[in-house]
Amino acid sequence: MRLYIPYISKKYNLDKNQKIIFWLFVLFWSGITVVRAYRKLYAISPMEEGGLGFSVILAAQITSAYGLISCFIRLPIFILSDIFNRKKIFIQIALFVLTLASLMVVLKPSYNTLYFSSIAMGICASMLAVFNVLFSETFSKEKAAISASILSIAPLLAEFIAAPIQYLSTYGTYKNFKLLWALSASISIVAFVLTFFVRDVSYSAKRFSFEKVKKVFEFKGYLYICLIAILVSFIKFSTSGANMIAYAKVNLNMPPIFLAYIDVLFAFPQLIASVLAGTYFANKIGIEKTLVLGLGSNLVFYIIILLTNSYLPAFLGYVFNGFGYGIAYTCLISMAMQYFEKEDRNVSMGIFQLFFAMGVYFGDRVYLWISKLIPNGLLGFEQNKSIYLIVVGITLVSILMAQFKIKEDI
């Protein structure tokens, strides 16, 4: 990895500002990654094990706050950043909120502080697309897909930073969840300082207007891309992160070392897939077939989960989930940007992220609905496995949409 990053830097001739944005994103995402996957486990773990002892319903409410806030702020962030012609300030605000929320959890862990922490993570996650636009604006229109692929390396580095921290905090019978939130605050403070070295890309062109919105929707395939984004984000967030950690711990009795590194096992193939999607597959087989390839990879993982009750196949099979999401997200985010000029990407990405956030919210919220509507499971599968059966159906619908409609519209 240390050799790969200098290679990318040299190959694409990244300047100082591009490198700073990249490393800022690594730290920014590390502050989230350290705690994001452990929200649900912290909430449902018994108090004698360091948790808060909440019910599954309360835990689902906490995790779904992440997506709920995203639904409200993703589009306004892009509109405001376009109006003020600034993006860095929003990243700084997000880091401040995350630091404050993490410190509150450390000082007084409760439903309210953990809920606020989840909201703060959702605010920060909404900045992912801001980073993508900020980074893509330093590239030409033709290299939008390449910029997305380069930036996709950062989350993997964040996972490598977070994994040993997560293991050291949770390997014992008593889990030191507070330490995770304390380190999240520390990393976020370092990232906040680094933001002052980033240079915003400003335009003299006309800023936000409804003419820009109209221009975006004049591209007839754009809304269809957004609809697929809802499904892809639902698929991802209902079967990974906090939900996967909780499922693996409670249902599969996965050991702490595996739990700590399971997100790395997701992020590494996600990185490979993200790079290959923009630099190889899209050129060889086309963007719609590349998207289908990614969704097919997701499908392999869901079938593995449905067929096994052992943690090892689930752990190893998680590679397919990461690879599939890496391809799917890169394809969708590239399509949401590459058909528009630089000054229009804020609007196109903001609308896209609004749709994407809906899937994030429902991906967490679905666990609350399942616990209430199908307490005994679905079609012979117990309650916690039923989500994977539902996701199989949604993935098949997404594949059909990608295969038969995108090519027709774009």
Predicted regions, residues:
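Structural signature of the two symmetry-related core transmembrane helices
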Residues: 89-103, 289-303
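Juxtamembrane intracellular "pre-TM" segments in multi-pass secondary transporters
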Residues: 1-18, 200-227
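Helix-loop boundary and gating motifs at the non-cytosolic
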Residues: 4-67, 224, 234-252
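Helix-to-loop junctions at the C-terminal end of transmembrane segments
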Residues: 73-85, 273-286, 371
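C-terminal membrane-cytosol helix-exit motif in multi-pass small-molecule transporters
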Residues: 166, 185-204, 398-406
